Amino acid sequence: MNMHEKILDNLQELVYIADMETYELLYYNRALAEEFHIPQRLHGKCYEILQGRRAPCPFCTNGKLSQDGCYVWKFYNQLVGRHFLLSDSICEFNGRQVRTEIASDITEHVLLQEQLDKNLSLQNFINHCARKLYRQDADLPFLIDDVLAA
């Protein structure tokens, strides 16, 4: 194991390198191996090992990548049931063009945001009901029926 691999293996983020023509996984770090429950040096196509597919993914970012920077996106991986923030880039590795992907698990953040959205929606509904019921000149039975119908 070289120094670069040692550094990548100590990251919490999931990292892999795949050949852009063949989709062959050339490297992945320990965090990815643990998250996907795969042996440290399993060989295969990225779409097979990381997505459980038989063909390249319809959402593959190879066509969106350029030499100028990275492509950042969010994705829910059904195979492991986790949400990720992904950063993909092109580089040269052993004389070939490869995609490097770094993935941060944002599942807890996504679940928290969903809960906050539900709470905000409920709070807005309660405020709407309270405003309707607070009107002093309102017909209370009508307002109660109106609020219950909302």
For each feature predicted by the language model, list its residue ranges:
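Short regulatory/linker helices and ligand/cofactor-binding micro-motifs at input modules
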Residues: N124-D146, A150
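PAS-associated C-terminal cap
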Residues: M1-M3, S104-L120
